[in-house]
Amino acid sequence: KRPESLQYSVAAPSNAKAFIKKLDPNAGFSTVEYISKDVTEISRNDWSRHELTTEVDSVAEQGFYFQFGYNNVATSYNPSGVLYDNVVIEGGLAPEPTPAPTVDFCPNNSPNEYDDYTLTWEDQFSEDSLDTSVWSYMYGDGSQYGIPGWGNSEWQLYTGDAENVYVVNGCLYIVPKYSQSEDQYYSARLRSKDGQTFQFGRIDVGFSAPAMDGVWPAIWMMPEDDRYGGWPRSGEIDLFEGKDKLIDQINTTAHYGHDFHRYYSRWTSLTPQDYTSDPINHNVISLIWDDVGFEWVYNGVSLFTVEYASLPNLEPNPFLERFHMLLNSAVGGHYPAYAPNPDQYCKLNDTAACYDSQKLIIDYVAYYQKNTN
């Protein structure tokens, strides 16, 4: 209605309309839908109710804005003296029910095919056990590798025990667990050193990440030969890093530095359909790598591109050498924002269900070479 303090109401006949605009923040808040309804009269005394109907895709249109108001089409007059009350947005469909938590579910997705790349190696974890001709376990707190706390003051001890790492149903499961009797976290860390190396091409990994305070899952690569010396001189390539319950974010990084630790990194925010913890459908992180630079791609969308020429003091360039892959889920350390909460972790030697949202799950690792013709 119009405030009673204003002299005039809107009376028939009138070109006045009530309207709703749908705005897309990803396109400069441009109007993607305009819905209006004739409002021939607006009283100074009585409220009038006007209903307008639109459809909203809760996934594709998440974050869209709505504007509502009144406009006299004939004069483009948009008076400030119109009062609104009791604005109600009603959903026509019930939200999708939250799926029941799963245990050791594997989607068994197949690696993608690309017109400009040829698949040259893959591990779909289709056997009953880990292929130890490719993958080897790393153990302990890092001391035997010269990096106590794994260089990051991490809390966990790595094992090769079936409690922490196993292959079943076509997926690899890495499970950080808490031992109540020892007040100690255990997890697993695998690497393909001396088993499978990578040098240029495209690398795809199908995965789902855990979501607990203090967890630090990673899919990454280290140099096969340390040609230019220890870390970071010979480089490090992080395809994916997550932390805590921040499943709506993904971090991708290239580390290097002949003089001191340098890195080029990008945090990317994700919409719900791309959250990193998705035990039912999984996600695909890809690294496209050549002698010019890197591109990180997530679920088919480019996240981040870097050219070597833009990296200061890179030469001699370690990213022209061979690398191997690491898969692990750390607990605590410098990276997570929160201290680990034991109540959120699966328990060691416990018969209670350990849910897939508490595990780093790898569906496959696929390596492609770019076609030359």
Give the residues covered by each predicted segment.
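Extra-cytoplasmic beta-strand recognition segments
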Residues: 1-19, 48-56, 86-88, 194, ...
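Trp-centered recognition loops
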Residues: 3, 9, 43-51, 61, ...
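Extended, low-complexity, turn-rich repeat/linker tracts enriched in Gly/Pro/Ser/Thr and Asp/Glu
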Residues: 9-17, 26-27, 58, 74-76, ...
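Beta-strand acidic-aromatic groove motif in beta-rich domains, primarily in extracellular
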Residues: 13-25, 62-67, 213-221, 249-251
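Beta-strand signatures of extracellular beta-sandwich domains
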Residues: 17-21, 81, 88, 295-297
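Extracellular carbohydrate recognition and processing domains
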Residues: 27-61, 77, 240
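Extracellular beta-strand ligand-recognition surfaces/modules
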Residues: 49-88, 217-222, 336-349
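GH16 jelly-roll
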Residues: 91, 100-373
